Amino acid sequence: MSRIGLKPIEIPNGVEVKVTEDNLCTVKGPKGELVEQMPKEMIIKVEDNTITVSRPSEIKRHKSLHGLTRTLVFNMIEGVTEGYKKTLIIEGTGYRAAKQGKKLVLNLGYSHTIEKEDPEGISVEVPEQHTLIISGINKQQVGNYAAKIRDLRGPEPYKGKGIRYEDEHIRRKVGKTGK
């Protein structure tokens, strides 16, 4: 039984939700507009200021899609009202980030600098040389872009050098001891 799927979603003021017959969900809000194709098996109803998601049968696939669909719609509504952001911390001697127009320039200890173009719908701020703030209205895009940047130089367990999320804790290891 999907407990998450059974919860109705309240539509806040200033947000407009439309669902077509083939479950194409469009959410417009103060921060922008998101369009996403939901699973066709699910039944999505928009009534007054609430959205309910129900499943046609009790087979395993429908049960698993039930909570997923409800969460996807909820994330779209939250994205167009509040937005999402991830903060990355860069640690290490000589490791730093800078912004040049729409390009992010990273010095991560390699022999070359790494330049990344900001994807559509995502903004990257560099308040300090060692901090990146990635924000946007699509939760999946923000998370994917943050993960790609983190993968350029993941944190290592001995000195903690690399790129990590702000709320991430790195388990440190003890180095080898001399004789």
From Swiss-Prot:
<keyword id="KW-0694">RNA-binding</keyword>
<dbReference type="InterPro" id="IPR000702">
    <property type="entry name" value="Ribosomal_uL6-like"/>
</dbReference>
<comment type="subunit">
    <text>Part of the 50S ribosomal subunit.</text>
</comment>
<comment type="similarity">
    <text>Belongs to the universal ribosomal protein uL6 family.</text>
</comment>
<dbReference type="InterPro" id="IPR036789">
    <property type="entry name" value="Ribosomal_uL6-like_a/b-dom_sf"/>
</dbReference>
<keyword id="KW-0687">Ribonucleoprotein</keyword>
<dbReference type="GO" id="GO:0019843">
    <property type="term" value="F:rRNA binding"/>
</dbReference>
<dbReference type="Pfam" id="PF00347">
    <property type="entry name" value="Ribosomal_L6"/>
</dbReference>
<dbReference type="InterPro" id="IPR002358">
    <property type="entry name" value="Ribosomal_uL6_CS"/>
</dbReference>
<dbReference type="GO" id="GO:0002181">
    <property type="term" value="P:cytoplasmic translation"/>
</dbReference>
<keyword id="KW-0689">Ribosomal protein</keyword>
<dbReference type="GO" id="GO:0003735">
    <property type="term" value="F:structural constituent of ribosome"/>
</dbReference>
<comment type="function">
    <text>This protein binds to the 23S rRNA, and is important in its secondary structure. It is located near the subunit interface in the base of the L7/L12 stalk, and near the tRNA binding site of the peptidyltransferase center.</text>
</comment>
<dbReference type="InterPro" id="IPR019906">
    <property type="entry name" value="Ribosomal_uL6_bac-type"/>
</dbReference>
<protein>
    <recommendedName>
        <fullName>Large ribosomal subunit protein uL6</fullName>
    </recommendedName>
</protein>
<keyword id="KW-0699">rRNA-binding</keyword>
<dbReference type="GO" id="GO:0022625">
    <property type="term" value="C:cytosolic large ribosomal subunit"/>
</dbReference>
<dbReference type="InterPro" id="IPR020040">
    <property type="entry name" value="Ribosomal_uL6_a/b-dom"/>
</dbReference>
